[in-house]
């Protein structure tokens, strides 16, 4: 991290906006931050849905401890913002006994919901 009074230069910055609503931008700073994104306009699949943007991008930076971080993401109207990165926490593995129970339950036929 730079001291608060130090100016960080922009090494490169590009932006393209197209008449169809699509776009692309990227930048890189003097302290190693990089980011990019591409957006595409999509038509809704139903008549009552409007158009929406699907965005894909990434950013990377070096943390205060010197660790390099990188995040890739996609954002749309169905799933929202979905980031991925090797440094994100992951859930612990399912214990074997629970996994066996889940596997067994998956083999059973479904039963209808009881009516009130």
Curated annotation (Swiss-Prot):
It comes from the Eukaryota. The modification Pyrrolidone carboxylic acid is found at residue 1. Pfam families: Chitin_bind_4. PROSITE patterns: CHIT_BIND_RR_1, CHIT_BIND_RR_2. The keyword Glycoprotein applies. Keywords: Amidation, Cuticle, Glycoprotein, Pyrrolidone carboxylic acid. Residues 20-92 form the Chitin-binding type R&R domain. InterPro entries: CHIT_BIND_RR_consensus, Cuticle_Struct_Prot, Insect_cuticle. The modification Proline amide is found at residue 116. GO terms for cellular component: chitin-based extracellular matrix. GO terms for molecular function: structural constituent of chitin-based larval cuticle. Glycans are attached at residues 90, 107, 110-111. Component of the abdominal endocuticle. PANTHER family: CUTICLE PROTEIN (PTHR10380), CUTICULAR PROTEIN 47EG-RELATED (PTHR10380:SF241). This is Endocuticle structural glycoprotein SgAbd-4. It comes from Schistocerca gregaria (Desert locust).
